[in-house]
């Protein structure tokens, strides 16, 4: 993993291109049709528009298998690149190094090569984890020479007399990096009937109207990181398409939109296509035994069915390997662990040291 481009090792961008050229495939992602032109335009302009994502793997004596790609609004960067690095520097006396020790430098390098504007608004929800995640990215931006401001929630945003989007200091909002998932904005679009509009229903700027997430992220003049096209590789509907395009790829798991004969024989994981944080996942054995189940807010979504490939249990915890992509390349690795088979938002980040032999 250290020596190759993760985007090249897993043909996920090839699959993304295939989806965006085929209406029948794109329909599988449950994205409102009113956004399809925006999606395709975002993909056409993709060069230097993606900063970072995270791939989640299972790695054991059987080899390496990818579960999914968090291409949009990935997290765990702070824990891997800062907290564990401090531990490695001050609390660890053995050999080896933290494999995410250079993550902040990689992020800064990606920002330097991006097409971001000189001032970046960092948009986050009012969440403790997102607080430090936003601060870590702000440090990378500062290192890359950008000015920035963190916006917690949308309360500070408003319209000026000319109908432009501004922050509490009166600064124009035209470039943002977000911790919000694109799916949150897409859900806002779903709440408005598509038949009522010939264009994306964003507000154009009346001083008495509140600013919604879609009014920021879907404004044509606002450059957004991560870009809209990342909802395609970040949506689990990409996984059956990857398997169809590259069956038996050594890093992929058999995945389908139904429980096919092979999945019935191996057991399978049931996952909502736009689910997050390990929510609403069922693990079913080849004997139809429910091995684990999580709850959440994604129960109404379409599901995919992925070959059962359980995490290894090491010292009482099931351990997952997470690898960060930065500009499409390897940026670092961390481990997540849980006493249950499914890694969730509250699952631990485990210490990791790599020793070269």
Question: What are the residue ranges of the model-derived segments?
Answer:
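Extracellular structured ligand-interaction cores
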Residues: 7, 52-54, 320
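Domain-scale recognition of functional cores that engage charged ligands
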Residues: 60-61, 73-79, 84-357
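Extended, Lys/Arg-enriched charged tracts that mediate electrostatic binding to polyanionic substrates
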Residues: 19-55, 129-131, 135, 139, ...
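Short Gly/Pro-enriched turn/cap motifs at secondary-structure boundaries
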Residues: 1, 44-48, 273, 312-314
């Amino acid at each position: 993993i250290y020596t190759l481009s993760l985007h090249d090792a897993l043909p996920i961008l090839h699959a993304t291109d295939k989806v965006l050229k085929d209406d029948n495939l794109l329909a599988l992602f449950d994205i409102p049709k009113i956004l399809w032109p925006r999606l395709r335009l975002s993909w056409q302009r993709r060069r230097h528009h993606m900063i970072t994502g995270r791939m989640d793997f299972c790695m054991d004596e059987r080899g390496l298998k990818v579960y999914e790609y968090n291409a949009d609004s990935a997290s765990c960067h702070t824990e891997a690149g800062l907290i564990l690095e401090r531990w490695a520097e001050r609390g660890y006396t053995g050999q080896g190094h933290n494999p995410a020790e250079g993550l902040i430098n990689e992020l800064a390098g990606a920002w330097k090569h991006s097409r971001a504007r000189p001032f970046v608004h960092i948009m986050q929800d009012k969440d403790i984890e997102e607080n430090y995640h936003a601060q870590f990215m702000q440090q990378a931006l500062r290192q890359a020479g950008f000015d920035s401001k963190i916006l917690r929630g949308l309360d500070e945003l408003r319209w000026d007399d000319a109908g432009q989007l501004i922050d509490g200091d009166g600064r124009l909002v035209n470039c943002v990096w977000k911790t919000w998932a694109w799916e949150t904005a897409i859900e806002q679009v779903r709440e408005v009937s598509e038949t009522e509009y010939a264009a994306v229903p964003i507000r154009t700027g009346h001083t008495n109207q509140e600013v919604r997430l879609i009014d920021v992220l879907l404004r044509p003049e606002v450059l957004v990181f991560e870009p809209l096209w990342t909802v395609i590789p970040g949506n689990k509907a990409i996984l059956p398409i990857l398997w169809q395009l590259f069956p038996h790829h050594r890093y992929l798991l058999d995945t389908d939109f139904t429980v096919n004969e092979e999945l019935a024989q191996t057991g399978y994981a049931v996952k909502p296509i736009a689910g997050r944080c390990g929510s609403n996942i069922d693990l079913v054995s080849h004997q139809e035994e429910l091995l684990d189940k999580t709850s959440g807010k994604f129960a109404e979504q379409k599901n995919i069915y992925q070959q059962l490939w359980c995490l290894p249990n090491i010292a009482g915890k099931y351990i997952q390997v997470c690898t960060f992509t930065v500009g499409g390349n390897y940026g670092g690795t961390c481990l997540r662990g849980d006493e249950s088979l499914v890694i969730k938002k509250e699952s631990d980040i485990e210490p990791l040291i790599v020793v070269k032999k």
